[in-house]
Curated annotation (Swiss-Prot):
Taxonomic source organism: Mycobacterium sp. (strain JLS)
Principal localisation: cytoplasm
Any GO molecular function: ATP binding
Pathway given in the UniProt record: Amino-acid biosynthesis; L-threonine biosynthesis; L-threonine from L-aspartate: step 4/5
Gene of this entry: thrB
The protein's name: Homoserine kinase
GO biological process: threonine biosynthetic process
Amino acid sequence: MTQTLPAGLTATAMVAASSANLGPGFDSLGLALSLYDEIVVETVDSGLTVTVEGEGAGQVALDSSHLVVRAIEAGLRATGCVAPGLVVRCRNDIPHSRGLGSSAAAVVGGLAAANGLVSQTDWTPLTVEQLIQLSSAFEGHPDNAAAAVLGGAVVTWTDGAGAQARYAAAPLRVHPDIHLFPAIPQQRSSTAETRVLLPDTVSHTDARFNLSRAALLVVALTERPDLLMAATEDVLHQPQRAAAMPASAEFLRVLRGCGVAAVLSGAGPAVIALSTEPELPAEAVEFGIANGFTIAEMAVGDGVRWSTGVAAGR
């Protein structure tokens, strides 16, 4: 049985950017960042209106193919609801196609906005576990999606494949001494474009290397930030992607040469540095700025949140 939502319901969702992989944790580790998109959705009698401010304005579709709209509709279907019409307003601060989880944020934010609508009815909103499952199914892997749902850092895993895949995540508490410095270039790149650069198989030696570093990274993130340099080494995906984003690869070399644990953020081309120092070395900052990177310190991001009505602002 499907319930049609009445017109006049309004909900707001706030969802964080995220950095996946963190070096060795390919498709497994994720970290939310304190950079947020806001979604406001209202039920109306009929039709669909989509507006976008900020990142993606004038570039993304403003119809039912918009990722936020698809996620809202999927969230409503999963709870047994349908909207007669929708007005969707997106205010985006997360850069698109840079490796900062913008698509995961769109999906998680849309699902959360649907929860905000459903919470005003007698029907039951999606649980956290359902949010992770649905958003990860959209993405095809759970690292960014789970980080956006839960906030903080996450270890994620997948059981099964295809339509039977089940996604799960466990939260990690990031050590308070760790400072996060995302560096965002003008260059864009999609995950699909860079995945084709990766080989179908890897050597046992390389697999063993990354397994040890990914395990060490969990320790470094939570208890021993002094181990971050060793823990962020990777041989499975960053070297293979370097030719497609030479400025990012060189910036990583400069940062790590200065003793800063730096990795590609997701599939790149953004870079993220994890440091116990409150500032990055001047040499690295100068290189980044000269090569078109915008560098800013961010905190660990919060998990997605939703509310009824229109938020007063950020």
